[in-house]
Amino acid sequence: MAHPDSSIIPDSVQSEYLFYHGRPYGSDALLGPLEVLLNKGFAVAQFQNRDRFIFDYNYGGRHVWKSITDLRGSVQRFGGWNEVLRTEVLPTSFEWKNWKWAPNYIGHVFEGGVTNRKIEEWYRVHGIPMPGVAAFLTTMTSAVINEMYSHPGVNQGSASTAMDLLLFDPLGILLFRHDRVSRFFSKRLGARIWSGQAGLTPSGELVNNGNNLILKVPLSLIPGTSFFTRAGLAFTPGFTFHGTNGLDVSFGFGAEGRIQGIDPMTGEEIPQLAFGGGVFLDRQGSLLASVLASEVEHRRLVVNIYPGVIPVLGGRFGTWFILRESGALRFGVSARGALGVGLGGGIN
C-alpha cells in the first residue's frame, strides 16, 4: 500500500488544497474531469429503474432547455411560486413528501460545491489554465447531464430542474469558492467526496458509478471517533474510528435510493428508498476500499478496492464487483491516471 504521506503536491503548498491532496492511492488517484462527468452527471444510474446504456439513451435535452427558457410555464405546472418555495427552496415542512429542499441543499449545494472545489484544485495542480473556469464548466456540464439523464424523453420543463440549474448548482459553486467556507467544511466537518470506480462495459453499460458527500464530525466525548455521514442518493449515518497513519474505518447504515419516479405532469422527481449501508476504509480522506449492501435489486452487494491497495503492478490498478439480486455479476478494473474511467464486464 502506498505510503500515507505520499502526494504529488509539495508539502510547502499542501495547506492551500482543501479537498484534493494528490494522493496516488484510493479515490484521489482516480480524480479527473471524466470521473466527475460519469460519477456526478450520471449519479441517478444508481436507481434500479434507470437505463444504464448511456450511449443509446433518449436524453431529455428539450426538457432542460424548456425548464430554463420557459421558467414561468415550468413554475405554473408545479403549482406556482409559493409551492416551489415551500417544497424546493425553504424548509417550511418536514413531511416526507415536501422534503425536496433537502436533496437540493445536500446534493446540489454541498456535494456539488465540494465537487467543484475539488476538481478546481485538481486542475490547478495539473497546470490547467483558468482552473476556476474549467471547474465551473465541468461541474455545470455534469449538472446538465444529470437533469437530461433523469428526464428521458420529457419535452416540457419543470420547476425542479430550473431550480437545480439556475439556483442550487451555481450557489454551491459560488459558496465553495470562498476559502473560509471550504476550510470550515474540510477541517471542521471532515467533508470529502467519495466517488465510485465508474466503469463502461463493451456494450456501453455504465456501472459502479456514484458521487457521495462524506462528513466526519469529531466526537469530543469519545476520543478517536467521529460522527460519520454518507449522503448523495443515500443517507447512511454512523461512526468513524480513527487509526494510526491516517487510516480510518467508518460504518454507516440507513437509506439508499431505490427508484426514481418522474411525475409526467410536473416533471417532479419522486424517489423511493430502501435499506442499506456499508463499511469504508480510507487513508487521509482518500477512500481505499468499501463494502456496501442494500435492498436495491441491481446492487445487492458492491465491493470496491481502489488503486494503491493491491500491490500488483505498482498498485496502479483497482478492482470491483457488483452482485445483483438475480445472481448476475458485474466486475471491472480501474487504473490510476485513467481519469476515472474503468473497464467493466458482466455475467448474467
Q: In which residue ranges do the predicted regions lie?
A:
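N-terminal targeting leaders of membrane proteins
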Residues: M1-G113, V207-F228, T240-V249, I259-A274, ...
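Short juxtamembrane and helix-loop transition motifs at transmembrane-helix boundaries
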Residues: P91-N98, E121-P129
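Membrane-interface starts of transmembrane alpha-helices
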Residues: P103, P129-T139, S160
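Membrane-interfacial alpha-helical segments at the cytosolic side of multi-pass membrane proteins
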Residues: F110-H126, L166-S182, A338-G346
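Long, acidic/polar, low-complexity amphipathic helices and coiled-coil-like
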Residues: E120-E121, P129-P131, G153-Q156
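Short loop/turn motifs that connect adjacent beta-strands in outer-membrane beta-barrel proteins
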Residues: R124-A134, H178-S195, M265-G267, V312-L313, ...
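Interfacial helix-loop-helix junctions of multi-pass membrane proteins
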Residues: S142-L167
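Extended amphipathic alpha-helical segments with heptad-repeat/coiled-coil character used for oligomerization
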Residues: T161-N212
